[in-house]
Amino acid sequence: NPYSVPDLYDDMLNTFSPKKNAAFEFCEAEYFLAYKDNKVVGRIAGIINKRANETWNKKEVRFGWIDFLDDIEISRALLDAVAQWGKSKGMDTIQGPLGFTDFDAEGMLIEGFDQLSTMATIYNYPYYPQHMEKLGFEKDADWVEYKIYIPDAIPDKHKRISDLIQRKFNLKVKKYTSGKKIAAEYGQAIFELMNEAYAPLYGFSALSQGQINQYIKMYLPIVDLRMVTLVTDAEDKLVAVGISMPSLSRSEEHTS
């Protein structure tokens, strides 16, 4: 499919490994494959995020990384396997597609099938949500992805408002040229801020210290720092962070 971006296999294997993924501090998982005529025709992961369940006062088993051929019996068997596993663990609801945390790809595409996917989002065929509806699943939330075109120059009005806000609240915009330096000085603060800002988001569970350490080590030394902006207040406390990255979708296509 020309619009689908494949997973990075090493990254996916690390995500599934209790030895490599710090989310297993508060998650457990089980993985299932569906076979037909001795061929793999579907896959699914079952996940119990204990921290999220405690936060939202639920007993949910999550399903994620679901893929299947266009056969309702295959999708039914996969979801039944996760549901039964969750039930054996005391869960009473199944929900997904979700990952271990919000840093994993989530949701199911219901429109925009002719748009190039990204490495951080899920692409699926139109029959996927049709199967969900036939199996009695109901949509619980909408996530919308936007494409924004950036002008060559910042409009004067935007710049004036930015300058005014910075002066009024004594804010400072910080840029770095060293990944190790930004990790050492603000790595912990970046993820603590994310925990605070993301707390109200759908299904969110706060990152543990183990996860924070893992993400600092994984991401901050390699991101393009020209696309990372920090904002601090008068006391040098981090109050905002913006992280962007160039699209790797076309490059990812050549890894499959």
Label every model-predicted segment.
Residues T101-D152, Y219, R226-T229, A234, ...:
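Active-site/acyl-donor-binding loops of N-acyltransferases
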Residues A29, E60, A141-W143:
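Extracellular structured ligand-interaction cores
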Residues T55-G136, S256:
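Acyl-donor binding region in acyl/amide transferases
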Residues I122-Y202, M227:
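Acyltransferase donor/substrate-recognition loop-hinge adjacent to the catalytic core
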Residues A22-E25, W85-K87, L135-E138, D163-I165, ...:
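A general structural signal for short secondary-structure junctions and capping/turn motifs
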Residues N1-D37, I44-E54, K175-E252, S256:
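A conserved beta-strand-loop-helix scaffold within acyl/acetyltransferase catalytic domains
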